[in-house]
């Protein structure tokens, strides 16, 4: 059983994988390579002046691979159902079990519907601020939760929010993924008020 199963290999799914795998959770991404990023060129992603969408996705894949993410490339998830201890994902190749599932399938909301997630009046998946759906342990991100406001940077943020909530649940306390250089105290001083 994997800890986190992510359905979708675009900005939201790979962002989730980056945070969860980097922080030690066993993570599997099911990626059919159907991301809209292959039709995009990014000029509006903070910190990146300009990048082809396909290059951006390849860079993200390399990054999540470096943290040990298991990527099931080309495998489509046909169904997700809740179990007593998480979720079962079904594919043509077999079944996979996970403690958490993150749905990052763009505007395709079929898996969320079959899982029993609540929808809003606008027919998008209803989530809280952590991207968790009405089904405990199931998260939805990106275009699944918005009618029109689809941007790579928003989707990546959704994936990060889902990942941080999963990490907080697993660690039993609020979790933040800050990478601090070893010499931060020397460079920046003591930024923590002990009072």
Q: Each predicted region: which residue ranges?
A:
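Short hydrophobic core segments
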Residues: 5-7, 95-107
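Haloarchaeal acidic low-complexity proteome signature biased toward cell-envelope/secretome components but also
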Residues: 1-3, 14, 18-19, 172-195
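FAD-site-proximal beta/loop scaffold in flavoenzymes
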Residues: 22, 107-148
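A conserved FAD-binding loop/helix module that cradles the flavin
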Residues: 141-185
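Beta1-alpha1 glycine-rich phosphate/pyrophosphate-binding loop at the start
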Residues: 2-55
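A conserved short coil-to-beta-strand element within the FAD-binding core of flavoproteins
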Residues: 73-86
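A structural signal for the hydrophobic beta-strands that form the central parallel beta-sheet
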Residues: 71-73, 103, 140-141
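Helical element adjacent to the flavin cofactor pocket in flavoenzyme catalytic cores
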Residues: 53-71
